[in-house]
Amino acid sequence: MISKGPAGWRIFLFNIFDHAPQLIKDFTWPEHLMKGFVKKYPMLFTGGASSVTHMHFDIDLSHILHTQFGGRKRVLMFPFEEQHKLYRKPFEVLSLADFSHYYETNGSPDYKQFPALKLANGFDFILEPGDTLFMPAGYWHHMEYLDSGFAMSLRALHPTLSGKLKGAWNLFGLRTIDTVMKKTMPKWWYENKKKRIFENAE
């Protein structure tokens, strides 16, 4: 952990239990809250102050319990239905807009380039050490480390068959198409996607 000064580095989706399996005894799975936890993959997230997780939603459409252990984190979240107002990239789970330091006067995003962002309805809050955030499947989230800190995410598969199938399609269909097109027709694919992004936001 970095204890002095801002550092934009972070480690994400790190399975700490592969390296220290004894830690699995230090917590219990909250199965009284929801079922379907992917117990093989509890993930650790660490970052220095000022590091950023850019606006996205999790590709597998899992429900997530995100517990902050150390440091504070600023979070911006939106329901999945706000995707076009957030300028979602087609065939991806990312936003074209940059939300870095959105809470500062001179921060992003660029509302002139992305005017529909002003119409998106979401949540803006700070996670303190000891807080646990529930993120429903498909929720968009952008996170900024206000301090050096670390957190852990527990994932639970979508409870419905349609949700599981959509998650599988995102992983193995959507992503494959995007990868192939980026390799075979990169310029055309980029321009086509960019055009669709702004058309969808209108």
Model regions and ranges:
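N-terminal accessory scaffold of Fe(II)-dependent oxygenases
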Residues: 1-132, 142-202
